[in-house]
C-alpha cells in the first residue's frame, strides 16, 4: 500500500511539472507573437523609417525625408516644382 501511495505521489508531481512547463511555453509563445509587427508594417519599415509609399505625417518619418502628409514619396521633389 505504501508503494502505491508513493507511486501516485510521484505521478502527481510529474504531471504537475509537465503542466507547468507547458503553461510557461505557451506564455512565452504568446509573448513572442504579440511583439511581432503586422506583415505590412514589417515590409514598409526599414531602419526606423518608412520606405516609399508608407504612411506618414511628417518628413522625418520617411527614409526619403519626403512626406506628402499621407504617404512617403520616393524622393524629395525640387522646390521649384
From Swiss-Prot:
Alphabetized Pfam families for the sequence: Conotoxin
Origin: domain of life: Eukaryota
Record keywords: Disulfide bond, Ion channel impairing toxin, Knottin, Neurotoxin, Secreted, Signal, Toxin
Signal sequence segment: 1-19
Primary role: Gamma-conotoxins may act on voltage-gated non-specific cation pacemaker channels (HCN).
Disulphides: 49-63, 56-67, 62-72
UniProt name for this protein: Gamma-conotoxin-like TeA53
